Design a protein with these regions (language model features):
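Gly/Ser/Thr/Pro-rich low-complexity, intrinsically disordered segments
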Residues: 2-459
Length: 459
């Protein structure tokens, strides 16, 4: 029986196998040429970005270099990736713009003037015509004030202390909320500053929303806003209530702003010194806030070492002295004998009423600043950033102008970024830029404004 071939002969199969489609061999020269073109394009783009004088590119190149150099652990992004002469040119330009920060003009020279001092009186001269008379004349006792007159006096005293509060909006709020005056003008305590609160209908004379008014402790909180940012400006009317307070684990671990404030009798607190952001294993970015960056003094006790240079800019020292005044001095100046509390950071923002404009700190970041006004009031400013509540942050120049509007005479930048936070009366009133840290990062210390009522109770 003959063999049946269903799908063709063996010969046909062999023929087909011999004619299979050949795979194209790769041409190494063509691949190499493509890679060379890519590399040349990237190199050309790099040199254009680095050396062009185009204003748009030059602006963002300077911003990139400034951002890198202003960090504590990412300076290599500028120094290693860009030519030294390009980086130095930006540094030199910053030095020209900010040269006032390294001169005597950038150190505080003000002093406190007590306008309530008694005026010397001329001695009494006896009347020759009556020197033998012994007449006791009792002055007439003043008429007792009516309840309305007492209320008017208390109201006037309120607006004298809280001069920033718009009278019409305050009166309207009191009319809508008469319970506010249950204990009189001298005991008003309004608090709508919490993260879940919407604030009050009261405004400042500058149009800012009032978040809190605490008359017994003489504290005012204002909502401040701008293009793409928002924050809180707190005003402490009694500078004697301010001090720099440490974490109990300073040198080992930090505490949150709230923990430091609650432990030390504070009613208001904010970020102060920076810290070395490194853990025990040497990993940057994982620090616990315990290792202080620079020098500080807390209640007369000194800690840390002076940072003379950092990021090509000099640190400044903010000293709070026995006369309850802030003084901004160079870090290489001796610590004043009258200093009770101090910390070091950069830059100085306002010195003796002069705003120090800088091209160095122009990135949109969370900010923390502290200052003192011409009325000697303590000004605490914290700006949220990096998307917290839709706020992307701002630069120190904007912060300086805002503080200047409130009569600021001395102001310095504090540690910002994720560390920037403000706490008031038992709760945070600004959001940390890291949404996972509801109470903020651990800090080496914090500026704490003590409760006047609690201080009086312990004396």
């Amino acid at each position: 029986m003959s063999e049946v071939k269903l799908f063709g002969s063996k010969r046909g199969g062999a023929r087909l196998s011999k004619h299979k489609k050949k795979q194209k061999t790769k041409k190494p020269l063509k691949v190499l040429a493509i890679w060379l073109c890519v590399i040349l394009c990237l190199e050309g783009l790099y040199f254009f970005a680095v050396y062009t004088n185009n204003s748009f590119v030059s602006y963002w190149r300077s911003a990139y270099i400034n951002t890198a150099l202003s960090t504590m652990r990412h300076q290599w992004l500028a120094t290693k990736l860009l030519p030294k002469d390009v980086v130095q040119a930006v540094i030199d330009q910053n030095a020209k713009v900010t040269k006032i920060m390294d001169t005597d003009a950038a150190t505080t020279k003000w002093d406190r003037t007590d306008n309530t001092a008694d005026t010397p009186q001329a001695p009494d001269v006896p009347d020759d015509n009556h020197h033998d008379l012994d007449v006791n004349i009792k002055p007439a006792e003043p008429e007792p004030l009516t309840e309305e007159e007492l209320q008017a006096q208390a109201r006037a005293a309120f607006f004298e202390t809280f001069w920033e509060v718009d009278e019409a909006s305050m009166d309207a709020y009191v009319s809508e909320h008469p319970e506010v005056l249950a204990n009189g003008w001298e005991n008003i305590n309004i608090n709508e500053a919490g993260l879940d609160d919407s604030g009050t209908s009261i405004t400042s004379i500058y149009g800012e929303q009032v978040l809190a008014i605490n008359v017994p402790d003489k504290v005012l909180l204002l909502r401040v806003t701008g293009s793409g940012w928002r924050g809180v400006l707190a005003v402490g009317k009694e500078p004697a209530q301010l001090s720099l307070e440490n974490s109990v684990g300073l040198g080992t671990y930090g505490q949150t702003c709230s923990e430091i404030a609650e432990r030390t009798g504070g009613v208001l607190s904010m970020t102060a010194s920076g810290f070395i952001d490194i853990d025990a294993q040497g990993n940057w970015g994982n620090g616990n806030g315990g290792i202080l960056a620079g020098y500080e003094m807390s209640n007369g006790y000194a800690y840390g070492t002076h940072y003379y240079n950092y990021g090509n800019n000099k640190y400044k020292r903010l000293e709070l002295r026995e006369n309850d005044l802030f003084y901004i001095v160079d870090v290489d100046a001796p610590v004043d004998e009258a200093c009770t509390d101090a910390m070091e950071f950069q830059p100085a923002m306002i010195v003796d009423g002069n705003v120090l404009v800088s091209d160095w700190w122009v990135e949109k970041n969370p900010r923390a600043c502290i200052g003192q006004s011409d009325k000697y009031e303590i000004l605490m400013l914290v700006i949220e950033g990096r998307g917290a509540s839709g706020s992307w942050g701002t630069d120190v120049n904007v912060c300086a102008e805002l503080l200047k509007q409130h009569g600021c005479m001395q102001a310095m930048n504090m540690d910002g970024g994720t560390s920037a936070i403000m706490w008031y009366d038992g709760e945070e009133v600004t959001r940390c830029s890291n949404q996972n840290l509801s109470h903020g990062r651990g800090l080496p210390n914090a500026w704490v404004y003590k409760s006047i009522t609690e201080t009086a109770a312990t004396e």
